[in-house]
Amino acid sequence: MKHAGVLALVVLLAAGCASGTASPSKQTAAKPRCSARQLAGWQRLANRIHAPVYCPSWLPDPLDGVIGSRWNNIDAVSRDRSYLESWVWQETGLGAAGGELHVNLRGYPERTRIPKCIDADTARRTLIPCFADPHGVVRERGIAATVYTVNQDADQWHILYAWRHAGSLYAISEHVAPPVNYAKVRIYLNRILRGLVLVEPS
C-alpha cells in the first residue's frame, strides 16, 4: 500500500507539471506589431485611400517599411485609390560586394480581380495579367496568398504573393537578384507575410 501511495503521488505531480507547461508546438506566436514610425505612414495611407492597408512589421535589412524613409523609393497612389509602396537597397560591385534588395507592397481597394498590364515584350502592346503563373498557396495568420512567378511592371523578375481581404486585392513581392536567390526570396516573403499588420482607416 505504501508503494502504491508513492506511485499515485508521482503520477499526480507529473500530471500537474504537464498541465502547466505548453508544448512548443502549441504555443501561440506573438502578434506582430509595427513600430510607431512604420505605423504613422501606413495610417496616413489608409486614411488617404479610405481602405485598410497592411503595414510590414519586418522587411529584410536594411529595408525598414517606413513610408518616406531613405529606402522608400516609390510612394504612389493612383486615381482609383490603388497604391504601390516600394523599398530598395542597391550596392554596386563585383560578387558579394554588389546586389539589390527590392520589396513592393500593393493594394487595390474594392477590387479583387488581378489588374492588367501592358505587355512590353510585344509590338502590339496588348494587355496581360500583371500577376501570372501561379505556384501554390501560402497560408499565414489567416491570409491565403497565391504565389505568382511571372509578373509585370514594378514586379517584373519578382516573386509575388497576392490575396484578398474584405473585397480588396493585396500583394507583396520581392526581386530575385543577388544576394538572394529564389529559395531565399520565398523565405523572406513568408516572413513578411507572417509579420503583416492590418491598419484600418480612422
Question: What is each PLM-predicted segment?
Answer:
Residues A29-C34, A40-W42, A46-I49, Y188-S202:
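N-terminal leader/targeting segments and the immediate start of mature chains
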Residues C17, A166-S202:
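Surface-exposed amphipathic alpha-helical segments
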Residues P32-A166:
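Short, solvent-exposed recognition patches
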Residues T21-A22, G93, P109-R111, L169, ...:
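Residues that cap or initiate secondary-structure elements
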Residues L7-G16:
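Bacterial N-terminal signal peptides
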Residues A18-K26:
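Bacterial lipoprotein signal-peptidase II cleavage site
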Residues M1-L7:
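Bacterial N-terminal signal peptides that target proteins for export
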